[in-house]
Amino acid sequence: ARCDGSSLLIDCGEGTQEALKEKGWSPKPIDVICFTHYHADHISGLPGLLLTMGNAERTEPVTLIGPKGLERVVNALRTIAPELPFQLKFIELEENRHQFHIGPYVIDAYRVNHNVACYGYSISIPRAGRFDVERAKAQNVPMKAWSRLQKGETLELDGVTYTPDMVLGPDRKGLKVTYCTDTRPVPVIAEYAEHADL
């Protein structure tokens, strides 16, 4: 997924960099990598990807999400990529369901049925409501604040606090992608796939 200059990747097999190259996408803006499980075809491309991101002068932290044991598995793989110019943040999943808000993404992780700990993911990108000029005028919101409020910022002008909900209409339908792999059929998949765009 890509949104507002940020990218999210699910799994990182050995062909990941080639697939990114074919799409013309740089790995540098990948801020989040979600792992379904730790079989080699889902994680063996990580050391090379991290090195490529470092060589592209990335300095911002990268968040890694996956089943319990993530940090141990990644550190074992990093013996060939020990020095990185950015921090790795680890989120290890232990419960059956988790939800995270990272950057523009709402990430739902849910346990599926594989022969090792394995999770599926639903990635949602919420979409704010449209700017409502009449609503802004009715609440005496200064025009100089409109642009920042429309971008989701809260601000204070002349001792008055203005919030985005003062000028935005109801939330619009965002985008939802649900992904699961290597699992036996379980009801939770249909639950998270409901209303997904993909």
Model-inferred region functions:
Residues 14-65, 87-94:
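Active-site metal-binding motif and surrounding structural segment of the metallo-beta-lactamase
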Residues 65-71:
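Hydrophobic/aromatic-rich structural module bridging two neighboring secondary-structure elements via a short loop
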Residues 39, 69, 184:
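Catalytic metal-binding/acid-base residues of hydrolase active sites
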Residues 1-25, 61, 121-123, 170-180, ...:
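Conserved beta-strand hairpin/beta-sheet module of binuclear metal-dependent hydrolase folds
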Residues 60, 83-89, 102-103, 174-175:
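A short helix-to-beta-strand connector/capping loop
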Residues 72-79, 90-95:
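A gly/proline- and charged-residue-enriched helix-loop-helix capping module
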Residues 18, 44-47, 72-75, 119, ...:
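Alpha-helical elements of the RecA-like P-loop NTPase motor core of helicases
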Residues 94-198:
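Metal-dependent phosphodiesterase/nuclease catalytic metal-binding core
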